[in-house]
């Protein structure tokens, strides 16, 4: 018998230690498997530490096994990220999954997923209608779910957790899902005792501040950020035609022309802000930038 945790550990911090200890207490004797993103994470960024370094510290703090989630899933939107993670958990014959959640109501996740499954054709119709209106996929999906069930999830870990549960329900996986309350808001700019969000810890690391109160990971020098590669990205965009850019993964619907139009922006953040729109979320733009830098094509 085993239980899985899906994680990025970007970086591994006290909240993750709490989660592993919580699992050990609630599920004694169960082997803990971590499904961990590799060197790149879901938002299209470079992980703050290598996969091997994050794997090592997870094992040191109580995980029994760490499995790498393939790049093609780890660097994608929530529904694709969840698809890859749950397929891996199922292939490993792990029978339980646990995740952090803002609402912490697993029965609601399951019930809503079942309603959507029973009304899948109607859901797909609403989804297509919303996409035609120019909405991003996450927004279009949320509104389609809301129209069918009367409910939708707004908080990031609820959204991701719901995608996990949907994969279990839609694929009839023999996996039982559990959730628990998070120790801290994922992007809070304020710590709570010994806990701080991954976003805040990364910010502190890049500012050269001491983070030892919040994470056991040691950072002797500032990690490379995707922002540091903006000049390389600019060079590629300048040297490629719009037609050539369309060969890269996720580049479609004219986004290559927006990239060409705004490539003179002075910084990575300025560029993302200019290209960001109702249809193109900042997360999607960041993933495309990563794919272009890595040469990932369709």
From Swiss-Prot:
It is found in: Cytoplasm. One of its GO terms (cellular component) is cytoplasm. One of its GO terms (biological process) is tRNA modification. ATP binds at residues 6-19, 100, 157, 182. It catalyses: cytidine(34) in elongator tRNA(Met) + acetate + ATP = N(4)-acetylcytidine(34) in elongator tRNA(Met) + AMP + diphosphate. Keywords: ATP-binding, Cytoplasm, Ligase, Nucleotide-binding, RNA-binding, tRNA processing, tRNA-binding. One of its GO terms (molecular function) is tRNA binding. Its EC number is 6.3.4.-. InterPro entries: Rossmann-like_a/b/a_fold, tRNA(Met)_cyd_acetate_ligase. Its main location: cytoplasm. Pfam families: HIGH_NTase1 (PF05636). The keyword Membrane does not apply. HAMAP family: TmcAL (MF_01539). Catalyzes the formation of N(4)-acetylcytidine (ac(4)C) at the wobble position of elongator tRNA(Met), using acetate and ATP as substrates. First activates an acetate ion to form acetyladenylate (Ac-AMP) and then transfers the acetyl group to tRNA to form ac(4)C34. Belongs to the TmcAL family. This is tRNA(Met) cytidine acetate ligase. The lineage of its organism: Bacteria, Bacillati, Mycoplasmatota, Mycoplasmoidales, Metamycoplasmataceae.
């Amino acid at each position: 018998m085993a239980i899985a945790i899906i994680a990025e550990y970007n970086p591994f911090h006290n909240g993750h230690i709490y989660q592993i200890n919580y699992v050990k207490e609630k599920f004694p004797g169960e082997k803990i498997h971590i499904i961990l993103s590799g060197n790149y994470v879901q938002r299209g960024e470079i992980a703050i530490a290598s996969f091997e370094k994050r794997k090592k510290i997870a094992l040191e703090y109580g995980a029994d096994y760490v499995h790498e989630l393939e790049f093609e899933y780890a660097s994608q939107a929530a529904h694709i990220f969840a698809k890859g993670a749950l397929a891996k958990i199922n292939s490993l014959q792990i029978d339980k999954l646990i995740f952090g959640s803002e609402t912490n109501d697993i029965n609601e996740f399951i019930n809503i997923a079942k309603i959507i499954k029973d009304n899948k054709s109607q859901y797909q119709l609403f989804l297509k209608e919303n996409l035609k209106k120019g909405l991003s996929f996450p927004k279009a999906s949320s509104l389609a779910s809301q129209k069918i069930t009367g409910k939708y999830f707004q908080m990031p870990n609820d959204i991701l957790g719901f995608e996990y549960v949907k994969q279990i329900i839609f694929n009839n996986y023999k996996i039982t899902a559990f959730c628990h309350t998070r120790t801290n808001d994922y992007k809070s700019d304020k710590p709570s005792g010994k806990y701080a969000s991954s976003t805040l810890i990364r910010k502190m690391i890049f500012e050269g501040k001491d983070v030892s109160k919040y994470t056991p990971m040691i950072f002797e020098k500032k990690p490379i950020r995707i922002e540091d590669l903006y000049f390389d990205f600019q060079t590629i965009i300048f040297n490629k035609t719009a037609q050539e850019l369309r060969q890269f993964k996720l580049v479609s619907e004219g986004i290559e022309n927006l990239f060409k139009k705004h490539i003179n922006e002075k910084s990575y953040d300025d560029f993302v802000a200019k290209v960001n729109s109702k249809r193109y979320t900042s997360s999607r733009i960041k993933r495309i930038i990563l794919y272009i830098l890595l040469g990932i094509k369709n």
